Amino acid sequence: MEKSSIEIFDENYKIIKENIACAAKKSGRKFEDITLLAATKTVDISVINHAISSGISYIGENRVQEFLSKEDGFLPVHKHFIGHLQTNKVKDIIDRVELIHSVDSYRLAQEISRQALKRGITANILLEINVGEEQSKSGFCYDEAIQMTREIAKLDGIKIKGLMAIPPICENSEQNRPYFAKMKKLFIDIDTEKIDNSSMDILSMGMSDDYAVAIEEGANMVRLGTALFGRRKYNI
């Protein structure tokens, strides 16, 4: 008999918590030092709310329209935006999420600043770094990250809270270890610069296939979808 989505979540959540605790210990930290963000793209609202009731405190959506269609149904939870964000969609979510993970250009940062100022709020953002230097991916070049942090930090209505990265797709999660280590070094380097309006609080890296390695290398936030909820059903 096929397991329900809730049964799949319950089984996976237990295993993931154990894996996070183990990886955190290897990096000299505790389970509580790691934020588990549930990536809820295509996940039914009833399953999301079960996850929240089970202890998930942070959720991340990838698509603006899907987020807006589900937002009113969420139980109390920290809501983040983790997908590619078009400048013309910024106005739709700017005051609805606590953190935007995917700021991948100065132009996008400018629009977030503009919309935040219109609403009299401060938007918390992460800078997305193209750590694998892949032409197919967006994000700031690794070598320009410190300078771009300085430039974006000058924009009003924005607070830089850290970095996000998606390394290249690999057959083995160990192949991504050097990329995660590189991101941790950049995270420390930017923090050392003590740039005004920038605090390196969050290093968001690691997804379903490589989150344990990411934590071992210094991630303090991981974004898990398939590992928590099972294979996605693309019906939205």
Model-predicted segments: where are they?
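Conserved alpha/beta-domain cores
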Residues: 1-186, 190-209, 215-217, 229
